[in-house]
Amino acid sequence: MIFLATLPLFWIMISASRGGHWGAWMPSTISAFEGTCVSIPCRFDFPDELRPAVVHGVWYFNSPYPKNYPPVVFKSRTQVVHESFQGRSRLLGDLGLRNCTLLLSTLSPELGGKYYFRGDLGGYNQYTFSEHSVLDIVNTPNIVVPPEVVAGTEVEVSCMVPDNCPELRPELSWLGHEGLGEPTVLGRLREDEGTWVQVSLLHFVPTREANGHRLGCQAAFPNTTLQFEGYASLDVKYPPVIVEMNSSVEAIEGSHVSLLCGADSNPPPLLTWMRDGMVLREAVAKSLYLDLEEVTPGEDGVYACLAENAYGQDNRTVELSVMYAPWKPTVNGTVVAVEGETVSILCSTQSNPDPILTIFKEKQILATVIYESQLQLELPAVTPEDDGEYWCVAENQYGQRATAFNLSVEFAPIILLESHCAAARDTVQCLCVVKSNPEPSVAFELPSRNVTVNETEREFVYSERSGLLLTSILTIRGQAQAPPRVICTSRNLYGTQSLELPFQGAHRLMWAKIGPVGAVVAFAILIAIVCYITQTRRKKNVTESSSFSGGDNPHVLYSPEFRISGAPDKYESEKQRLGSERRLLGLRGESPELDLSYSHSDLGKRPTKDSYTLTEELAEYAEIRVK
């Protein structure tokens, strides 16, 4: 047997230390399973000058002093022992050979304790050795797990049981190792200070799933019912793995957002929430929330969760998308252009999701784009009709914002067709309506009189600017002859245009001039008729008083086409306008009535096809009197 084969080694060690003095050698501690036996190896020595004929010995329990009457475990002289050890103790060694090995059988827990040996050589040659052995009665195998078990690294777990009973030898097996991959088992017998230990070694590579796994070892004794089991839980260390995290998150501006990060690791990880390299929150925990109150578009972006411990780290990201209405659009580009130039205007905004962008002018859609943050408006060759106010509108499901901008188109003067002259008796009034940008200069030329009057001569010309329209009015008084030719000339830095102004109501002027002559002729004819009637009716005394008065000039016929966009009361405006024109054309002490049949235009920035409206705020005019 292995036990007997290795026992001489213990004796060799003891023999080498013999020095001819009182002394004993035995293991300081020894273990055995309950219900089995234990052999306590023992060797003693005494001085060489003592030559006893017979050597006796006594084993005591828990005390080395006889006067304390300790329980006698074994006594070679009388075989009288304490009742607890009756039938349980036996001396295996030969005291004559200084071998005091003791065998205890049918172990029970109360037998655990200290065992002392006393040598009896006869007479006064008795000696109780201070050396003793402590017996430990066990009932579970001892499973030894390394202090650090790391996932992915091979580990060795040992199961150790005492093997100090020569009559019963344990057999070891592992329990619960099926979930540990493909483990290998090795067995060996190990001697430790005179005691023997049966060892089973289990080799395996643990995983993170093995953390907390309950691993068992069983010691069974053949041909008996004795079985002893021991268990140990594996504490497997492994790096963090993030197992719980929000997917992409969408939130409306101003709402509350809670981001969760959960990780599995041993030991627990340090969890850190970060954004753009900045730490927002951290804690040693299995899960960590990041709460964002009333989120803004500035908090839109990618958030990272970092989990780390001494064995590694893991990280994941989540994208937070903050949904919000478009910001007020910004407009970059040309705001002033020359007629014929190409104009490029960029309207941009920011929103989530991207908006629908539209550019309007007078409720007409000029350009639009869907789900884009920028819109480019291209006008390849601008005209005066492109001048005006534009709107860039951005909208999505969360709101709408708009920005107005103006495009100013600069162009050469255009004298509108409603420009004309009107005459009544000795007064001529000329109206020149010019559309231009920038504001032009206006001059009236009378070729027959070799006279040129411009708008700076306020006593003759009145001018008023409204939007792109410039209205200049020239008043000529004392014109008794045929109406003069009047040429209106307008110029700015882009060009010059001239137009001979047509006359309206020229036939009325003619009748006004021949009116006195016609009255004289009519009077002569009337006298002749009266004389004839008098001669034929001599008996009739008829006194006729005939008077003829030329009367006032006939009323001037006004035929305006009054078109003012957005006017609340068209007819009231017409009456005010007529009164204003009468004041403008009024003679000294008279109210001349002229035929002014010209269109009225909206003084705002309207297309040229709209008519011109003369407002009642015009002042009194100076007169040019022609002798």
UniProtKB/Swiss-Prot annotation:
GO: which molecular function terms? Answer: carbohydrate binding; ganglioside GT1b binding; protein homodimerization activity; protein kinase binding; sialic acid binding; signaling receptor binding
Q: Which GO terms describe its cellular component?
A: membrane raft; mesaxon; myelin sheath; myelin sheath adaxonal region; paranode region of axon; plasma membrane; Schmidt-Lanterman incisure
Q: Where is this region: Interaction with RTN4R and RTN4RL2?
A: 20-325
Keyword annotations of the record: Cell adhesion, Cell membrane, Disulfide bond, Glycoprotein, Immunoglobulin domain, Lectin, Lipid-binding, Lipoprotein, Membrane, Palmitate, Phosphoprotein, Repeat, Signal, Transmembrane, Transmembrane helix, Ubl conjugation
Q: Which residues lie on this side of the membrane: Cytoplasmic?
A: 537-627
Q: Where is the lipid attached (S-palmitoyl cysteine)?
A: C531
Membrane-spanning segments:
517-536
Taxonomically, the superkingdom here is Eukaryota
Where does the record say this protein resides? Cell membrane; Membrane raft
PTM comment, free text: N-glycosylated. Phosphorylated on tyrosine residues.
Region (Required for normal axon myelination in the central nervous system), start-end ranges: 578-627
The cross-references to Gene3D superfamilies, in alphabetical order and at most eight, read: Immunoglobulins
**One GO BP annotation here?**
negative regulation of neuron projection development
Tissues of expression: Detected in the myelin tract in brain, especially in the corpus callosum and in peripheral nerve. Expressed by myelinating glial cells in the central and peripheral nervous system. Detected in oligodendrocyte processes before formation of compact myelin. Restricted to the periaxonal space after myelination. Isoform S-MAG is the predominant isoform in CNS and PNS of the adult (at protein level).
Against SMART domains, the record matches this protein to:
IG, IGc2
User: What pairs make up the disulfide bonds?
Assistant: C37-C165, C42-C100, C159-C217, C261-C305, C347-C392, C421-C430, C432-C488
Q: State the membrane topology.
A: Single-pass type I membrane protein
Domain (Ig-like V-type) spans 22-120
Gene disruption phenotype? Mutant mice appear normal, excepting subtle defects in motor coordination and a slight intention tremor. They have similar numbers of motoneurons as wild-type at birth, but display an important loss of motoneurons during the first week after birth. Five month old mutant mice display a decreased ability to remain on a rotating cylinder. Contrary to wild-type, about 40% of mutant mice have severe episodes of whole-body tremor, both during movement and when resting.
Database matches in InterPro entries:
CD80_C2-set, Ig-like_dom, Ig-like_dom_sf, Ig-like_fold, Ig_sub, Ig_sub2, SIGLEC
Q: Which residues form the signal peptide?
A: 1-19
Give a yes or no for keyword Hydrolase in this entry: no
Record's keyword annotation contains Flavoprotein: no
Q: What does this protein do?
A: Adhesion molecule that mediates interactions between myelinating cells and neurons by binding to neuronal sialic acid-containing gangliosides and to the glycoproteins RTN4R and RTN4RL2. Not required for initial myelination, but seems to play a role in the maintenance of normal axon myelination. Protects motoneurons against apoptosis, also after injury; protection against apoptosis is probably mediated via interaction with neuronal RTN4R and RTN4RL2. Required to prevent degeneration of myelinated axons in adults; this probably depends on binding to gangliosides on the axon cell membrane.
The text of the family note is: Belongs to the immunoglobulin superfamily. SIGLEC (sialic acid binding Ig-like lectin) family.
Q: What name goes with this protein?
A: Myelin-associated glycoprotein
Gene assigned in the entry: Mag
